[in-house]
Amino acid sequence: MALTLTDVKRIAHLARLEMADADAEHMLGQLNEFFGLVEQMQAVDTAGIAPLAHPIEQIQEVAQRLRDDAVTEVVNRDDNQRPAPAVQDGLYLVPKVIE
């Protein structure tokens, strides 16, 4: 997939970005390099490779810095909502901002 200068300008317009022609050409080169890298990664055959939940789990010499989650304190909803200006049925009431 290769973008054109028209594509870059259209994307900038949709994102409401002002972009000079020189900047658009520079961005075109960077985006096409990125998409080229993505195409190279997609071409790699990964059929026999199991997915990793975390890449460090495959390195035996590196100690896991992850620990099991443990409850350290109980959250009391009433205590947390006491300073709120308005609550109802355990939910915070906020002013309407979109009509």
Swiss-Prot record:
The keyword Ligase applies. Disulfide bonds: none annotated. It comes from the Bacteria. One of its GO terms (molecular function) is asparaginyl-tRNA synthase (glutamine-hydrolyzing) activity. One of its GO terms (biological process) is regulation of translational fidelity. Keywords: ATP-binding, Ligase, Nucleotide-binding, Protein biosynthesis. This is Aspartyl/glutamyl-tRNA(Asn/Gln) amidotransferase subunit C. It comes from Burkholderia cenocepacia (strain HI2424).
